[in-house]
Amino acid sequence: MTTPTDQQPDANHYLRHLCRLNDTQEVTASEDIYNQFGVLLIAKGSRINPQTQTQLNQHRLKKSLDGQIALQSTLTDELIFQRALKMLEKSPELWSLHCSNRFEAPFRHLCLSENLPLQVRQKLTVMDVQLPDLFEHCLFTGWAAALIAKEIGLKPDICKNAYTCGLLHDIGLLHISADVQTPLSEDNWRALQSHVVIGQRYADDCGLEKSIGRGILEHHERLDCTGYPARKAANKLGLLGQLISSADLLHSLCTNELSRSRHSMHDALPYFKIHRGSFNEAIHSAIIRLLSRTTSDQLDQDTDIPPVNLQRVRDTNIQLKALWLPLLELSQQASICAQPEWLKVSTMMVSIIGILNESGLDDELLSSWLITEMDLDDQANQLDLKEIDAMQYELLWLFKRLGWNLQCLIDAHETPESSASTALAAYHTQLNEQLEQAFSRYLEPKQPSPSSLHEQEQEQEQEQAPPSQQQLANAENAKNAADSDPKSATLSE
């Protein structure tokens, strides 16, 4: 079976971006471009237009295309910094978080002392023009990753690498077809995983520190083995990937669920509580501290926020229990098989069991409270229901990710027919049916193009705009390779 690491970067999609950019500014060959056999394809100074695109598409190049092109106008470190500030200033909460944590001077220093290579700034320029939403997502991720690193107390050079890694973490999406990025089906999810491999290779080819390339590769991995592309064990993961992963998820929350329902960043706390096992303790604690310093008081108190759908909370709680109950036995059956993919699926199941136990969503007292008659005008009840609804929604996506991995395992045919494989296949069928029903409760009739929550699984459906201009990863993501991170439903309360 083809894995993400087997796939080669697709220059065709990137060439399309360059051709479109050539409509607004000159994009030329900075040197003679040869194919792998040394045959001249494009002479130095030639414009990258549809004619040269066709010529280049027919050959494997001797060198990477990125090192052989020149843009008439390229982002500078100062311009990237100013764009990041503009992005923060658009949100009073983000700007307040930036200033209250005294991050103005440190952020300016790490942005302007970075001296990003020309090749990197050119790539970011292409992203800025062709995929502006993705570029803003990368600005946020670089800023947030550096802020979290500072909150932890990491050294300035690590904060700087976190910023750079965040800027480039989704650079591989320039090489991925927009058709793959949305909607995020099982097949598209597999293809999308290659963007982290492409991004790592690009960072390494640009001469950036190896830790940056590794961070790009691992930014959709999770400590509980629920990520991709390799579902590495916790002791095999580096720090940068986990910093980017957490920043990726934060952006997905802020730009999708929380912004649409006029909630504050403080309301992201339930989501990160669910993902406690996904990040190391230092990163998780830093995020909780940062979010705890924000406040919902900045919301317009005169605007009515729709109450939580109580019946949805009740029904979802029942379904989550039905999906959770078979996991322990299934995880034990899967662990008996010595093959790595089976063990990873078993680990994912155990992780979900632990998350449910820690969240208290499986508690009988909670179930009893949910079915009682309650005063929905009571603010305390609404706050509790809002947090429960948010956590349950995240758990549904953990089950969704489990389903994708089960499908990969089933398709791999790694073991002969057995009681364990039969049980997993039956559970996979049940899981898909239950999730389809559960997610349908979150669909907004007036929003036919629901946005995703992640990474990573981290993209947004944008039917009103040309795909070449507005596609996101979203995420995780991706923001949901990431979870970074894309989703088929939006949370409406």
Question: Where do the protein language model's features map onto the residues?
Answer:
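Membrane-cytosol interface segments
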Residues: 2-102, 367-427, 451-455, 483-489, ...
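Active-site-flanking alpha-helical
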Residues: 176-177, 225, 255
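Conserved beta-strand-loop-short alpha-helix elements that form
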Residues: 243-255
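Histidine/acidic-rich helix-loop-helix segments that form or flank divalent-metal centers
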Residues: 166, 203-245, 259-263, 267-393, ...
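A general alpha-helix detector
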Residues: 37, 87, 144, 198-199, ...
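Phosphate/pyrophosphate-binding active-site loops
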Residues: 188, 198, 255-258, 273
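Compositionally biased, intrinsically disordered low-complexity segments enriched
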Residues: 454-486
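Acidic/His-rich, divalent-metal-binding segments that scaffold phosphate/diphosphate chemistry
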Residues: 50, 65-210, 235, 299-304, ...
